[in-house]
Amino acid sequence: METSVNFDPSNMPQHVAIIMDGNGRWAKKQGKLRVFGHQNGVNAVRAAVHFAAKYGIKVLTLYAFSSENWNRPATEVSALMSLFIQALNTEVSKLHKHNIRLNILGDKTRFSDSLQKRIIESETLTAHNTRLTLNIAANYGSHWDITEATKKLAEKVKLGKISVTDITPEKVQRALVTAEQPPVDLLIRTSGEQRISNFLLWQIAYAELFFSDVLWPDFDETSFSEAIYAYQQRERRFGGCE
């Protein structure tokens, strides 16, 4: 749904992250299987990407599949993997056409060889695009992310490239999967749930949080606008005083 908005362009978040929640409940309300909700959630992804590109957000990170989601029923996991491949096959050329870069964040080694190959192709095709960076967090968990960053730094210490005293928050940040990207300014979670679910724990240290009651497949430009308006009305202090 398109809506007329009037944001303060000087106060737009650079990096917005969204926990896309509520597909299963949305499907249940329709009397359908959970996979029906996931399929319709793709439309909300398109809307969110369009909105972010339209209003100058530089990085959009979407939580698509957590490392804990492997514990879901095998049929649902299989359907999600099929949907992932289908989305890459149909959407990447459109992203490239609109100058949008695609990154897949997470441990890709558990994916099938064909999916890993398609991910590499998609990231390579869009690598030099500059309008918007779209991060899809898939088989991602923040504990994994921070652990892997720690391993990278420990290996550098072991090889004598750095000393323990050289390790700073900035070096940890650069070892995370988000690397040189800006920290998250605004974290949105849909469906009314109010928890972080092991998502970008380091990156959201000073993020503003917005919890929407809208189920993800119904999340549209109006819903996104409400989150941006709320963000622009807040005073970010980053630990300082008023």
UniProtKB/Swiss-Prot annotation:
Q: Is the keyword Cell wall biogenesis/degradation in the record?
A: yes
Q: Which UniProt keywords apply?
A: Cell shape, Cell wall biogenesis/degradation, Magnesium, Metal-binding, Peptidoglycan synthesis, Transferase
Tell me the GO molecular function terms: ditrans,polycis-undecaprenyl-diphosphate synthase [(2E,6E)-farnesyl-diphosphate specific] activity; magnesium ion binding
Which InterPro entries does UniProt cross-reference here?
Answer: UPP_synth-like, UPP_synth-like_CS, UPP_synth-like_sf
Catalytic center residues: 21, 69
- One biological process term in Gene Ontology: polyprenol biosynthetic process
For this protein, what does the record note about how its cofactor is bound?
A: Binds 2 magnesium ions per subunit.
Summary of the function given for this chain in its UniProt record: Catalyzes the sequential condensation of isopentenyl diphosphate (IPP) with (2E,6E)-farnesyl diphosphate (E,E-FPP) to yield (2Z,6Z,10Z,14Z,18Z,22Z,26Z,30Z,34E,38E)-undecaprenyl diphosphate (di-trans,octa-cis-UPP). UPP is the precursor of glycosyl carrier lipid in the biosynthesis of bacterial cell wall polysaccharide components such as peptidoglycan and lipopolysaccharide.
Family, per entry: Belongs to the UPP synthase family.
How would you summarize the oligomeric state and partners of this protein? Homodimer.
Q: What is this protein called?
A: Ditrans,polycis-undecaprenyl-diphosphate synthase ((2E,6E)-farnesyl-diphosphate specific)
Taxonomy of the source species: Bacteria, Pseudomonadati, Pseudomonadota, Gammaproteobacteria, Pasteurellales
